[in-house]
Amino acid sequence: MEQKQHILKQSTFSSSPSSYSSISDRPISLLSRNGLLLLLLALVLLLGVLLPWPGSPLFLFPNRLSSSLSPSPQSKWRDYTLAQAARFVAKNGTVIVCAVSSPFLPFLNNWLISVSRQKHQDKVLVIAEDYITLYKVNEKWPGHAVLIPPALDSKTAFSFGSQGFFNFTARRPQHLLQILELGYNVMYNDVDMVWLQDPFLYLEGSHDAYFTDDMPQIKPLNHSHDLPHPDRNGETYICSCMIYLRPTNGAKLLMKKWSEELQSQAWSESIRFKANDQPAFNLALNKTAHQVDLYLLSQVAFPTGGLYFKNEAWVQETKGKHVIVHNNYIIGYDRKMKRFQDYGLWLVDDHALESPLGKLE
C-alpha cells in the first residue's frame, strides 16, 4: 500500500513539470503568432499610406519612395520627366499638349474648361515653362504638368514678339518630337483657344500631320485639304497654334525640320519673320511637303481669330459648325481677355469649377 502511494506521488510529480511546461507554452506561442500577424498587418497599412498606388504619378519616382515625408513636396516634380508624364496622362495612345508660363495660367484654366466639356481633360499635359506653373498645376492636378529644363523667365516670355517669347515658342517642335518618339499621337493647342466641339471627330483619315490655315480670307466649305500654294512672296500662312501629329516617320521629319529652321535663324526684334516660331513652321511644311502626308483642317471648323472675331456675317452663316476658336489677330494679354469676355468665351469667372484646376488664386 505504501509502495503504491509512493509510486502515485512520484508519478504525479514527475508529470507535473512537463504538463505545466506544455500549458504555459501555449499562450506564449499563440501570442507570438497573433503578434506576428498584427505586425504584418500594420506594415501593410503603413506601406499603403506611404506608397502611392501604381496609377499615381508619385509611383513614377522609384528612388524617392520617402518623398511623401519630404519637407518640400514640390521638389519631387523637378525629377518628373516627359516620358513619365506622357505615360501617366496618355489615353488611347494620345496626349494633348499645351505650353504655359505662369502669367497665362488664367488662359490655361479657361481652355481647360472648354476641353473638359468635351471629356478630353484627362489626356492633357501642361508643359510648364517655369517652376511657378509646374508647382501650381501639380498642386491642383497632380501629374499633369512637367518642366523640361531649362526653365524660362516668365517675364520675358510674356510679350509677343519679344526674344523671350521667341525662345518660349522655339522649343515647341522639340517637345512634340520627344512625345512622338515615345510612340504617342499628340495634339498641340495654344491656350488662347476655346473648344466648342470635339476636335477629334474632325481628324479624318490617317495622315501624318493636321493643321489650320491662319488666313482670314473665306474659303469654300468644301475647300482642298492640301497644303495651300505659297503666295507671290513664296509664303504660306499655316498656324502653329493647333497641330495634331501621329507617331510616324513623316511627322517626326516635320518636327525635326521645324526645329532646324528655328535654330538656323536668330531672333530679331526688327524682323517679324524671326519673332515667333510660325514662319519656321511654314518653311518646314513646304520643304517636307513631298515626304510628309499633310492635311489642312476645315476652315469653318477651325477658324482663325482674324475671321471669327472680325466677320460677324460669316460667323452667323456658319453657326454651329465651329469646333475650336483661336483668339489671335490681337496683341496684348488684357485685350485677348476682353475679347473673350465680349464674345462669351471667357469661362473662368463663372465656370472655374469645371476645370481640373478649379479656382486659381
From Swiss-Prot:
Topology in membrane: Single-pass type II membrane protein
Family annotation (InterPro entries): Nucl-diP-sugar_transferase (IPR005069), Nucleotide-diphossugar_trans (IPR029044), UDP-D-xylose:L-fucose_XylT (IPR052636)
Compartments, record wording: Golgi apparatus membrane
Organs and tissues of expression: Expressed in roots, rosette leaves, cauline leaves and stems.
Annotated transmembrane regions: 35-55
One GO cellular component term noted in the UniProt record for this chain: Golgi membrane
The protein's required cofactors: Mn(2+); Mg(2+)
Glycosylated residue positions: N92, N167, N222, N286
Lumenal-side positions: 56-361
Cytoplasmic side: 1-34
Posttranslational modification: Glycosylated.
A GO term for molecular function: UDP-xylosyltransferase activity
Written domain comment of the UniProt record: The conserved DXD motif is involved in enzyme activity.
Protein task: Catalyzes the transfer of D-xylose from UDP-alpha-D-xylose onto L-fucose. Probably involved in the biosynthesis of rhamnogalacturonan II (RG-II) through xylosylation of the internal fucose moiety of the A-chain of RG-II, a structurally complex pectic polysaccharide of the primary cell wall. RG-II is essential for the cell wall integrity of rapidly growing tissues such as roots and pollen tube growth and elongation.
Protein name per UniProt: UDP-D-xylose:L-fucose alpha-1,3-D-xylosyltransferase 1
Organism: Arabidopsis thaliana
Record lineage: Eukaryota, Viridiplantae, Streptophyta, Embryophyta, Tracheophyta
